[in-house]
């Protein structure tokens, strides 16, 4: 585990209500910065915890997809209403079993390019977990 980070920034909206927002400060090819910490690898965001995505269980599918996909054998952060998979520039494959499991669990699964995935996390931080691909 890379450590527990305060991923939510509180601010007042126009009506004087408190809202939470995730603090993604920078991302580029090969890295992402969240709350001042730069990660040079894919990350998993699970209820406020940021950790390295452990791809090893999915590497056996690499030849089939030409890229290490997200497979059901990884530690996927299922405890959420929405799971966002940031596909980098669109290159990260998501295996059918992951899609089926999300449907079985009644979790909204969004597979989006990294920029759109980050925007989605900012809009719904309290009910969304994520896997973010940063290396392509």
Describe each model-derived feature in a short phrase.
Residues 4-21:
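Short, Lys/Arg-enriched N-terminal segments with co-localized hydrophobic residues
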Residues 18-59:
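N-terminal, charge-rich interaction modules
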Residues 39, 75-80, 123-126:
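Flexible, charged surface loops at secondary-structure boundaries
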Residues 52-77:
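Compact, glycine-rich, soluble single-domain proteins
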Residues 117-136:
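Short basic, glycine-rich beta-strand/loop surfaces that mediate nucleic-acid
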């Amino acid at each position: 585990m890379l450590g527990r980070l305060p991923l939510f920034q509180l601010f007042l909206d126009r009506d004087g209500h408190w809202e939470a927002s995730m603090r993604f400060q920078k991302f580029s090819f090969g890295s992402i910065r969240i709350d001042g910490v730069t990660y040079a690898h894919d990350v998993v965001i699970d209820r406020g915890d940021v950790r390295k995505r452990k791809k090893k269980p999915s590497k056996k599918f690499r030849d089939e997809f030409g890229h290490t996909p997200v497979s059901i054998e990884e530690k996927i952060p299922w405890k959420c209403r929405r799971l966002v998979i940031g596909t980098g520039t669109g290159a990260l494959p998501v295996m059918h079993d992951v899609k089926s499991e999300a449907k079985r669990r009644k979790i909204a699964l969004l597979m989006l390019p990294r920029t759109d995935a980050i925007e989605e996390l900012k809009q719904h931080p309290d009910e969304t977990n994520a896997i973010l691909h940063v290396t392509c």
